[in-house]
Amino acid sequence: MGGYRVGLGVDVHAFADPAEGRQLVLGGVRIPSERGLRGHSDADVLAHAVTDALLGAAGLEDIGHYFPDTDERFRDADSIWLLREARRIVGGGWEVVNVDAVVICERPRIREHREKMRENLAAALGVEASRVSVRGTTSERLGFTGRGEGIAAQAVCLLERAVGT
């Protein structure tokens, strides 16, 4: 069989209460917002979806297996660092061909932050930014994202077997 594998990653996080003082982080970018997302790490849904897509493409366990929310070492962890670690776990036997990701929320709009998100994700994966796509969409006011209760993200990662492996 060929040397390509694809993985799908999905993540969702609810907004935290403003009194918790959490910052909103998407793709490693701190985005001005009254509310951040609730989570054990920095709750970066975009980075988490990409991480799960990468791990899935390599046929490995999910993000929670490697970075469990029961482990205090990962409390408030930088999710771009988690992605970088997941890339290390996947190892050199696979090359990232591309990643396509979408953030699903009514607010905030991510357009002005997309390029920096792409750069952050690409750097963590060890590829040029042209191999990473980040888009935003709404759920047309349907479901928990439509009601402004949280943010979701989905990502697809294509891996190719590295030459000589």
UniProtKB/Swiss-Prot annotation:
Name the reaction it catalyses: 4-CDP-2-C-methyl-D-erythritol 2-phosphate = 2-C-methyl-D-erythritol 2,4-cyclic diphosphate + CMP
The record lists 4-CDP-2-C-methyl-D-erythritol 2-phosphate as bound by 11-13, 40-41, 62-64, 67-71, 137-140, 144, 147
Q: Does the keyword Metal-binding apply?
A: yes
The feature of type site (Transition state stabilizer) is located at: 40, 138
Identify the keywords attached in UniProt to this record, alphabetized: Isoprene biosynthesis, Lyase, Metal-binding
Names of the cofactor(s): a divalent metal cation
Answer whether the UniProt record assigns the keyword S-adenosyl-L-methionine to this protein.
no
Tell me the pathway.
Isoprenoid biosynthesis; isopentenyl diphosphate biosynthesis via DXP pathway; isopentenyl diphosphate from 1-deoxy-D-xylulose 5-phosphate: step 4/6
Bound cofactor: record note:
Binds 1 divalent metal cation per subunit.
* UniProt binding sites for a divalent metal cation: 11, 13, 48
Which Gene3D superfamilies does the annotation name? 2-C-methyl-D-erythritol 2,4-cyclodiphosphate synthase
For this UniProt entry, the molecular function terms from Gene Ontology, in alphabetical order, are: 2-C-methyl-D-erythritol 2,4-cyclodiphosphate synthase activity; metal ion binding
- SUPFAM superfamilies assigned to the protein according to its UniProt record, in alphabetical order: IpsF-like
Q: EC number(s) on record?
A: 4.6.1.12
Q: Name one GO biological process term.
A: isopentenyl diphosphate biosynthetic process, methylerythritol 4-phosphate pathway
Q: Which PANTHER family match?
A: 2-C-METHYL-D-ERYTHRITOL 2,4-CYCLODIPHOSPHATE SYNTHASE, CHLOROPLASTIC
Q: What family, per the record?
A: Belongs to the IspF family.
Oligomeric and partner information: Homotrimer.
What does this chain do? Involved in the biosynthesis of isopentenyl diphosphate (IPP) and dimethylallyl diphosphate (DMAPP), two major building blocks of isoprenoid compounds. Catalyzes the conversion of 4-diphosphocytidyl-2-C-methyl-D-erythritol 2-phosphate (CDP-ME2P) to 2-C-methyl-D-erythritol 2,4-cyclodiphosphate (ME-CPP) with a corresponding release of cytidine 5-monophosphate (CMP).
Protein name as catalogued: 2-C-methyl-D-erythritol 2,4-cyclodiphosphate synthase
Q: Which gene encodes it?
A: ispF
